[in-house]
Design a protein with these regions (language model features):
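Walker B catalytic acidic pair
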Residues: 135, 188, 211
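Walker A/P-loop
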Residues: 195-196, 200
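Conserved beta-strand/loop subsegment of P-loop NTPase cores
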Residues: 97-104, 125-136, 155-163
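N-terminal accessory targeting/assembly segments
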Residues: 1-112
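Histidine-anchored nucleotide/phosphate-binding helix
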Residues: 113-128
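Canonical P-loop GTPase G-domain recognition
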Residues: 138-192
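Flexible beta-alpha connector loops of hexameric P-loop NTPases
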Residues: 107-108, 137, 213-217
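Switch I (effector-binding) loop of TRAFAC-class P-loop GTPase G-domains
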Residues: 203-217
């Protein structure tokens, strides 16, 4: 059956896969395209303003003309306070993920207090945390062992992996997390290797992976 992409279809379930200020990349059963917010839809529900990963209901009007009506309930989400509201309401920055890869580099970025705070954020988000200690190829075996043990003592009950995006050390242990029906979000400081990991993993499998914008804690 051929779908007429120009025909209007109301209340179609779609997912946000990209955000460009007031434009959103969406994907649904009818295809992919751009969508805008229905005027006035989020005036009284700013916290539910669409973000990447959200499931939404749209009026499909073609690849680049669809209208977002409402955001469906989230199973998990990260949020940060919106500066324009003087801290009165929070803005979601990623939604509907299954696991949170908390990334810290095994060098100057390694910080147990920050790791503890990220773990709290991950559990509160509704996702399951996994700690990735990156750039394992840049430290000695002794330093790696010491920091791995320290992280495991902080992240009780959480899987902790040491990986290298250069040598692919630890990548085999990531395979259990790479399932097409699951979504992963990456959380960590700038420079720890988030974008590199995304590029490496998406060459090996098809799976939604999101990078959370900076959350200051």
């Amino acid at each position: 059956m051929t779908i007429n992409k120009g025909t209007k279809h109301h209340d179609i379930k779609a997912r946000i896969i990209g955000v460009h200020q007031d434009l959103f990349d969406i994907t649904c059963s009818l295809g992919t395209g751009l969508a805008r917010i229905k005027q006035g839809s989020y005036r009284d529900s700013a916290a539910m303003y669409p973000t990447i990963g959200d499931q939404v209901l749209v009026n499909w009007q073609g690849p680049d003309q669809s209208i977002i009506n409402t955001t469906l309930p989230r199973q998990s989400y990260f949020k940060r306070l919106d500066g324009a509201s003087c801290g009165h309401w929070a803005q979601a920055v990623a939604a509907n993920f299954d696991e949170v890869f908390i990334m810290q580099a095994l060098g100057a970025d390694f910080n147990l207090r920050r790791l503890e705070r990220y773990l709290t954020l991950a559990w509160e988000s509704g996702g399951v945390p996994v700690v990735l200690l990156t750039k394992a190829d840049l430290v000695s075996s002794a330093e790696l062992a010491t920091k791995l043990t320290a992280a495991q003592e902080i992240a009780i009950g959480v899987e902790v992996l040491a990986i290298s995006n250069q040598s692919h050390q630890g990548y085999s242990a990531l395979q259990a997390h790479l399932q097409p029906v699951r979504t992963i979000v990456l959380l960590g400081s700038s420079g720890v290797g988030k974008s590199t990991l995304v590029n490496q993993l998406q060459q090996k499998c098809w799976q939604p992976i999101m990078i959370v914008p900076v959350i200051r804690i």
